[in-house]
From Swiss-Prot:
Intervals, Cytoplasmic compartment: 26-63
Disulfide bond annotation, renumbered to this chain: none
Record-given protein name: Signal peptidase I
Record keywords: Cell membrane, Hydrolase, Membrane, Protease, Transmembrane, Transmembrane helix
Gene Ontology MF annotations: serine-type endopeptidase activity
Catalysed reaction equations from the record: Cleavage of hydrophobic, N-terminal signal or leader sequences from secreted and periplasmic proteins
Major place of residence: membrane
CDD domains: S26_SPase_I
Length: 314
């Protein structure tokens, strides 16, 4: 969907740009005629009227060119709005948040192939980034950057903590262990609905659910502090996690030019723990602000506006 919209904007900009060029040429020619700079006795009144009609038609189409051009440039190279559709980044981002993504944060890229044209700065650990899914470029995800190229990452299933060391190699091991601290967990108002069926397995039973309350924990990775949600009442197993070649499960070494992403809602997020690393070329940009927030649940209509959520993202 993301690439389709970009291609549509590009084609629309090119087509209206052609009409805009014809309109400019036609307008200049009419200007010369009206000033009697072109001496052409074959221009009768009827032909002049037809020329005016054609000019009006061209003007109507050409008027869209500046609009499409501005949208294409801003959306492709500067800022792009996104909507948060799921709760994988709770409590930092909620369903119904509309965010602004800075497209030039990780380099100015060609909008179709995403080849980096001008490098700006590298992604930082702790950034919240929008990216294309590694295997399906039509799907955009938003997660927090946890692992940088060369990092060795270990995820502890028991306490759900992460352990990171930088510039790992088989010969010298880790260069530096990243400081990661966790607060004591406390109860929160965030709820995870667990759906189930009754004995008769009736279709309407999709509306029957039990609710589990998330615990909230402060996670501090070096100097980046943020909150994460955990379902401590649920114990995960290793089976579904991504296993890197020649590595034990739950331990990964981030390849060169790739990144390890995780959602802040740790027990309700499909991320690099499940499908692997994200290439740098897949990074769309850095999420910087919430510009609108509707009070809504997933797959439901909004019931209000959350003005207090508008502002910067941390």
């Amino acid at each position: 969907m993301a690439n389709i919209l970009t291609i549509f904007l590009l084609i629309s900009t090119l087509v209206t740009g052609i009409f805009w060029s014809f309109y400019c040429i036609k307008s200049f020619k009419n200007y010369l005629i009206n000033k009697k700079i072109i001496n052409n006795n074959n221009f009768h009144q009827e032909k002049i009227e037809k020329s005016k009609n054609k000019t009006y038609f061209l003007k109507s189409l050409a008027s869209f060119f500046p609009i499409f051009l501005a949208i294409f440039i801003i959306r492709s190279f500067i800022y792009e709005p996104f909507q948060i559709p799921s709760g994988s980044m709770m409590p930092t981002l909620l369903v119904g948040d509309f965010i602004l993504v800075e497209k030039f944060s990780y380099g100015i890229k060609e909008p179709i192939t995403h080849k980096i044209l001008i490098r700006t700065k590298k992604p930082n650990r702790g950034d919240i980034a929008v990216f294309q899914h590694p295997t399906d470029h039509n799907i955009n995800y938003i997660k927090r950057i946890i692992g940088l190229p060369g990092d060795k990452i270990r995820y502890d299933l028991h306490d759900k903590h992460i352990h990171i060391c930088t510039n790992y190699s088989d010969q010298r091991g880790c260069e530096k262990k990243i400081s990661i601290n966790y607060s004591q967990s406390r109860s929160s108002n965030f709820i995870q609905k667990i759906y189930f069926s009754n004995k008769n397995n009736i279709k309407e039973d999709k509306n029957i659910y039990n609710s589990l309350y998330f615990d909230i924990v402060e996670e501090i990775i070096e100097d980046v502090k943020h909150s994460i949600l955990l379902l401590n009442s649920i114990k995960n197993t290793k089976e579904n996690y991504f296993q890197q070649k020649n590595m034990p499960k739950l331990t990964w070494i981030v390849p060169k030019g790739e990144y390890f992403m995780m959602g802040d809602n740790r027990d309700n997020s499909l991320d690099s723990r499940y499908w692997g690393f994200v290439p740098e070329k897949n990074l769309v940009g850095k999420a910087i602000k919430i510009w609108m927030s509707f009070d809504k649940n997933e797959n439901e209509w909004p019931t209000g506006i959350r003005i207090n959520r508008i502002g910067s993202i941390h």
